[in-house]
Amino acid sequence: MTTVSLASQTRRKTGDDRVRYLIIIFFVLAFVPWRSVAMPDDDFAAHTVDAVSALHHWYNPNTGLWKHTGWWNSANCLQGVEATLALSHDQKDQAVIENTFNRNAANNFLNDYYDDEGWWAETWIRAYDLTGQARYLNAAKVIFQDMTNGWDSHCDGGLWWSKKRTYKNAIPNELFLLVAIRLHQRTAGDGGPGSYFYWATNEWHWFQASGMLNSQNLVNDGLTSDCLNNGDTTWTYNQGVILGALADLYKVTGETNYLARAEAIADASISTLIDQDGVLTEPCESNGCHGGDVPQFKGIFIRNLAYLYSVDRKPAYLDFISRSAHSVWENDRNNKNQLGLKWAGPFDSADPARQSSAVMALAALAELSKTTNVSLNPAEPQH
């Protein structure tokens, strides 16, 4: 796989180009109504656009990132913009995606954390799918190539969380698998050593043997220094990314064991990681989930559950997505269309992580309603 410089792709931008871009982005965010184009005929497409419009309150066009949140969170915020682009095909959304890319391409979207890199790779693959612009796919290839450097023989394989090599855990490995199989789907090549497919299958073989998948079909956070399951929290996002990756492995190979494992994890998640009303929750929500990471997690799960549903059409998943989206909009929203941490409500506070996470529930239902004969009123959860 050939590494290319993203900076070289953007060097031709002149100073006038950059000024023009800032003017366009400022105009888009400040003055243009975001619900201005034809969208699917359902409320949740409109709700998604309204919620993403609120998300842009924190967008900084000078940096191409969202204020008051982290680097990896901004990748997921951008996936919220991509969700509205998929629904509305509005060029205003595409302008934000382009601005974020142009403002940050010089460092190839690399940093000291392999999971952060994976989020950006996933985001640029999605941008490629929506726009057809090869530079986004090239960005994902560059990121993936760097991620391969995180694999070594400690614990018989797997990626480290960071380049300091102190912790092997679930999320960088799930993202590595997801990005590998999606690059395989979008590029020519065989499955030989060093190929994207090779990495995807190697990663999955290692992951399922690592012990991080526990006896309840849930993924714990990571491994001890002795390469054992550390028993840490079964965060929702660790259950989510693996669903999308396994769904794509099934699509590529036709091997039903991938789909069966994805469904086992999904079934365990939607029956366990919920409150008394069947709404997705994190274990820390009773004390506010301090920090900027956890508020991002639930949207990642829903995004990948929706992708799994698009493959297997299991009714329980659609009902769960519908219940989540309804609860977010009805119980976890203020009068500015800002969305909070607790999807069951009440609204607590607003920030880009909370907002972009909840956007994923709205967008998932809106997107599925385009292709599914779906009642937008969820069934009562079964206890």
Region locations from a protein language model:
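Short coil/turn and helix-start
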Residues: 91, 130-135, 189-195, 256
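Cleavable N-terminal signal peptides of Sec/SRP-targeted secreted and luminal proteins
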Residues: 21-33
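Alpha-helical scaffold segments in carbohydrate-active enzymes
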Residues: 54, 83, 103, 126, ...
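Long alpha-helical scaffolds in large eukaryotic adaptor/regulatory proteins
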Residues: 88, 131, 180-183, 187-190, ...
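CBM-like carbohydrate-recognition segments
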Residues: 39-121, 127-130, 136, 168, ...
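N-terminal secretory signal peptides that target proteins for export/translocation
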Residues: 1-19
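Active-site cradle of extracellular carbohydrate-active enzymes
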Residues: 173, 180-184, 193-249
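Extended ligand-binding groove/face enriched in aromatic
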Residues: 95-186, 198-201
